[in-house]
Amino acid sequence: TVCVYRTCDKDCKRRGYRSGKCINNACKCYPY
């Protein structure tokens, strides 16, 4: 799957994280 920054960020925020970033085409969530 291709990681889309906007989608990833929104997804992470919905799950209670502060932000999301694409790393090696994977969505990673960050609490800060």
Swiss-Prot record:
GO CC annotation: extracellular region
Domain of life: Eukaryota
Tissue: Expressed by the venom gland.
Intrachain S-S bonds: C3-C22, C8-C27, C12-C29
Protein location: Secreted
UniProt-listed InterPro entries: Scorpion_toxin-like_sf (IPR036574), Scorpion_toxinS_K_inh (IPR001947)
Annotated site residues (Aromatic residue of the functional dyad) in this chain: Y30
Keyword list, A-Z: Disulfide bond, Ion channel impairing toxin, Neurotoxin, Potassium channel impairing toxin, Secreted, Toxin, Voltage-gated potassium channel impairing toxin
UniProt site positions, description: Basic residue of the functional dyad: K21
GO molecular function: ion channel inhibitor activity; potassium channel regulator activity; toxin activity
Pfam family, one: Toxin_2
Protein family per UniProt: Belongs to the short scorpion toxin superfamily. Potassium channel inhibitor family. Alpha-KTx 10 subfamily.
UniProt function note: Blocks human voltage-gated potassium (Kv) channels Kv1.2/KCNA2 and Kv1.3/KCNA3. Does not block human Kv1.1 at 100nM concentration.
UniProt-recorded name of the protein: Potassium channel toxin alpha-KTx 10.6
Organism: Centruroides bonito
